[in-house]
Amino acid sequence: MKTKNMLLLAGLALAPIAAVQAQQHIEVETIWNGTFAPKQLNALNTLHTKNQYSVLDMDRAQRTFTIDAYDFTTLEKVQTLFSTAQHPEIAQISDYQINQTDDKILIATDYNPIYRRSFTSVYYLYDLATQKLTKISNNAIQEPLLNKDGSKVAYAFENNLYVFDVATQKTVQITNDGQKNATINGITDWVYEEEFAFVRAFDWNADGTQLAYIKFDESDVPVFSMDIYGEELYPQQQVFKYPKAGENNSKVSLYLYDVAKASTQNVALNAETAYYIPRIKFTNNANVLSVQTLNRHQNQLNLLFVDVRSGKTSTVLTEKDAAYIDVTDNLTFLDDNSFIWTSEKDGYNHIYHYNSDGSLNHKVTGGNWEVTDYYGYNKANQTIYYQSVENGSTKRDVYSIRLNGTHKKQLSSVSGTNSATFSPDYKYFINNHSSNTKAPSYTLVETASGKKIKEILNNDMLETTLKNYNLPTKEFTTLKNEVGDDLNAYIIKPKDFDPNKQYPVLMFQYSGPGSQQVADHWFDTNDYWHFLLAQKGYIVVCADGRGTGFKGAAFKKLTQKELGKYEVADQIFVAKQLAKEPFVDADRIGIWGWSFGGFMSSNCLFQGSDVFKTAIAVAPVTSWRFYDSVYTERFMTTPQENASGYDDNSPITHAGKLKGNFLLIHGTADDNVHVQNSMVLINKLVHLNKNFDWLIYPDKNHGIYGGKTREQLYTKMTNYLLEKL
């Protein structure tokens, strides 16, 4: 197996040497000033009752925003639904929602972020028929949601829920116990938002008579605080509830609010099996609410139906897994309240059709490949539309299949990464395509024939610009790990690569459960930085090791209870194989990563000191004891149950093995991976009298951005590698 691995790399090395012209070189500033940013369709939404889609447009010269509707068939603009030119009270639009009857628009302005997904905005409701603009509240509110007929808007403000009546313009407060760091109604707490990936924890039923919501009791959740330094004499302190692994989580409960009666009822749930409520969604039956619940270990998921008239629950579906179960938004109810569901219970993520009583009607898709996105169901021809990796785990294609599992058809035709936005009648879709060699483009496609109707947008100008930079190429391959698994990988070599010379190598990875870095899509900012390094004489290699995604549940869940063990082993093994290549300077191999990738790069340098010379860790987890409960326990259970799993693979445990060059970077306002992680590791390294470098960014969060911050950060990392690798 090792011989095959080396031959493969050697094959890459012997590729013809391209003639190098005197062209521009990438600079760090160029990466972050928008030079390489591709054009894209902003805020594209499919309308519900018309064969149209809407787009948020901005006229920079006039400084006006418009919400425009386009015909799916002709791609011609049909009308401007809303323009700030006619409504000067709205200076800018940050987001918008069109209701299900396409006659009202919720418009957000004065955007103010809270955490990763949450924000407050001032919202207006625009009636397309009357052209009347109504301010929902004078306050900056969260997550307003129109009911189906657009007569009422539910929203959250300062941890309480409200209902605004559009006709009377009166507001009813439906909860009163909301309090910061104590009780939240209808909005998720920090850990739900981060790890279950949603903010709005309420939903209207089909006829707008009932509002279901989740209440979060944070009283027993430990407090975390961060100093915000700013420029004042004394720093401010940001205090919020953050449950670390093994600590108390919010106690969640479910409620139903009857609009006509102005009354609320609690829905009784089992506290053990409903430890988490990661999703609520009304079915097509206005009297039936669906609720997904998880136990604390997240290895048993129940789908419940709640009768809103009686408040009684019934368990419709139960899934169990030896490791964990991922929560998705793919649940779709059909007219008869049977439902479409995705699951990896058979080893790969696939689509299933269940009857309304929870009995399996049919497994719709199957095979040793994964469904990666679900687009919708067309009841007219009983067809499901989805995205999958059937053509290889690094690629994405769009497919259709009948509800009974027949007549599967690939709708996308160009290799790479394809995603789709379908017209309301599913007769057309906008295909967003990119690949390692082709910048993003948007094309209108006829669904039935797969025929391309018209190109909507391309990035030919960007590709022309990039020709001036004579970029190296990403070469995709597979590498073997020590047990013979195929690992997806890419290698970037200098454009003037000479197989008779030796080059330093920088490895890049993220490695987190279910993640993917090696994929056939267009470049991101890290790619351009890697190209910059290649222009300076470095080879960059990335390999997705065990635990990463889209290759089946067994490969992804192998790391259960031992995060860092197999992932680190794979990166070290790949580095050792690279060191044997004649074109690699075996004494100059480094590795870097961010977040989970920083956890990995730290561990790789400490545990692989015989092969790694240098590592950069940005915002790393250094002990899973410091990270949040939902994410960590999903893969590790609790530290009380699995102390060795937490400690044996912690960089802090292996800090004494540090021999090479180590640059540790963190932002002090990181609400996700707290700077505590780096501080504890720093303290350990100092205690061990280890030489290392570190860089702290005051008041910067997990993304470490704002102003010139990213430019300064990547300049620092570039110079560090030039000096230390």
State where each predicted segment sits.
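Positively charged n-region of N-terminal signal peptides that target proteins for export
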Residues: 1-5
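Glycine-centered structural positions embedded in regular secondary structure
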Residues: 11, 185-186, 489, 590
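N-terminal signal peptide c-region/cleavage motif recognized by signal peptidases
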Residues: 15-17
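Serine-hydrolase catalytic core recognition
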Residues: 223, 286, 419-725
